[in-house]
Design a protein with these regions (language model features):
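Catalytic-loop region of hydrolases
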Residues: 1-62
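Short beta-strand element of the alpha/beta-hydrolase
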Residues: 44-46, 58-77, 81-82
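Non-catalytic, alpha-helical, charged scaffold/linker segments
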Residues: 201-205, 209-362
Length: 491
């Protein structure tokens, strides 16, 4: 299989969304590796404003200078197929459409995830398959840099949730030899895979420490409230414009219906409550071991009771979020529940009652939140093997295991955690990071994004973090701001 880009194999499409139209040249479903495990997934599509080919420009960018916007569709560590500009899997106009309007080249690469199996029934989507595939896609672009539209030295990755974690990995593990055996296995090009910048919405990352971080935040709240997606049966038909055509989502290329959400409410068992306390007590030790500091040089630490400068730092960022809303003229205090934890004086957000704020947000997951002692989480499946569906990935949950589960190798866990590579001089890091974790997002602890941002900043990497007001677990909700950020670092 050739990895040469065929610039003559394209179509010109007119795409209209929300009253706006873009004409783009599309190069679709191009294999980016020579030996794919799931051929219908391990491919990419390229979308280019057609005006570039007429010698024109948009927003100061042309065919050769345009940044390459590289979103992924990974969620829950499931497979993430290519997604054309237009509608996303929820039926909303996606970031790729607006990126074209802003003058970017869009590259949408599919990637394997949990649930993918080959003809022999082997699990081929376990870690580190997803990040390996995305790296292979970057290498394909570099392999064809003389033919590919856009600037391959200005690749900006973007993702949400597990996709945000993948974006953070792309930005922290560039060209690292740890991934080389996996890249060779799928026949990736022998090229660089570092990227220029990474946009990470609510990254579900630092998985081997996510349980302790979650309980630091939510310990003491024993009732949980969430909504889960009820997946349709394999092979069940769908006329949904996106999900109905997503290859490999069910692991076998089956057609999928639009997602339906089912509420789940309950109370943790006494055993889970005890585990919550244990995990909570372990977080300060982990946080202090990182030796983090803020932009003023103040050490970020926690006392044994979970309070300290790190908590104050998180609260300070939450106050910035509230202040942004107040400055925009929004009456955020009209909600009596907000008034229970946020104090505003003379138009200034001055303090947050942390415990009341956490109670306002509510707990979403039982303890342990990610490495369940009885397994069954998306992350347990992520760390499976070709013939074992799921495994533990923390010593704590292995010690408290209730189902006789095995534990993943440390190397497999390391490959999925950007924290291990930020200080590694061999890894080429992105120059810029943008991290957004909604103020009411409960899928992982606020601490996870804060720790990632502090670690990046301590390494001298330009990092922009915020907790947008009222935003739950979501991404791409502030595209004008995202694109302003991209323009600010690319022009």
């Amino acid at each position: 299989m050739s990895l040469k880009f065929n610039e003559t194999d394209f179509e010109v499409q007119k795409i209209t969304e929300e009253g706006r139209t873009v004409v783009c040249r599309t190069f679709e479903h191009i294999p980016y590796c020579e030996s794919p495990k799931v051929p219908d997934l391990e491919r990419l599509s390229i979308y280019v404003p057609e005006i570039f080919y007429q010698g024109g420009s948009i927003n100061g960018y042309d065919l050769h200078s345009a940044p390459i916007f590289m979103p992924n569709t990974i969620g829950g560590y499931m497979p993430g197929p290519e997604e054309a500009p237009g509608k996303n899997f929820m039926g909303k106009t996606n970031a790729s459409f607006y990126a074209l309007l802003n003058g970017y080249v869009v590259v949408s690469a599919g990637a394997r995830g949990r649930g993918n199996r080959n003809a022999e029934g082997e699990n081929v989507g376990v870690a580190p398959a997803g990040i390996v595939d995305l790296k292979a896609a970057v290498r394909f672009l570099r392999h064809n840099k003389e033919l590919i539209p856009g600037n391959t030295d200005r690749i900006i990755t973007n993702g949400t949730s597990a996709g945000g974690a993948m974006s953070s990995l792309l930005g922290t593990t560039g060209n690292h030899p740890d991934y080389e055996p996996y890249l060779k296995e799928i026949g990736a090009a022998d090229e660089r895979d570092d990227v220029f910048a990474s946009s990470c919405y609510c990254p579900i990352t630092n998985l081997d420490h996510a349980d302790v971080a979650y309980e630091w935040e939510f310990c003491g709240l024993n009732d949980y409230h969430r909504a889960i997606i009820a997946e349709p049966l394999e092979g069940e038909p769908s006329d949904h414009p996106v999900l109905g055509k997503r290859p490999g989502v069910d692991g076998n290329g089956g057609m999928m219906k639009p997602p339906k959400f089912i509420p789940v409410d309950g109370e943790m068992t006494r055993k889970q409550q005890a585990l919550s306390v244990e995990l909570c007590n372990r977080f300060p030790g982990y946080l202090n071991m990182l030796n983090l500091s803020d932009e003023k040089g103040q050490s970020m630490t926690l006392d044994d009771d979970g309070t300290g400068s790190f908590l104050n730092h998180v609260i300070e960022n939450m106050l910035k979020s509230a202040q942004k809303e107040l400055d925009a003229g929004h009456d955020i205090m009209s909600d009596s529940k907000v008034a229970d934890w946020l104090r505003v004086e003379n138009g200034r957000a001055v303090s947050v009652d942390w415990k009341e704020y956490v109670r306002f947000r509510t707990r979403m997951k039982e303890a342990p939140a990610f490495d369940n002692v009885s397994m069954g989480t998306a992350e347990n499946e992520l760390f499976g093997t070709t013939d074992v569906k799921q495994r533990h990935f923390t010593a704590f949950s292995k010690e408290h295991d209730t189902v006789g589960g095995a534990i993943a190798e440390k190397d497999q866990v390391r490959l999925m955690n950007p924290m291990y590579y930020i200080d590694d001089p061999i890894a080429v890091k992105a120059t810029h990071f943008r991290i957004r974790h909604g103020a009411v997002d409960r899928d992982t602890s606020l601490a996870i994004s804060e720790i990632l941002a502090l670690k990046l900043e301590d390494a001298g990497i330009d990092t922009d973090i915020a907790h947008p007001w009222g935003i739950p677990h979501a991404g791409d909700y502030d595209l004008p701001e995202l694109f302003d950020w991209i323009d600010s670092i690319c022009k």
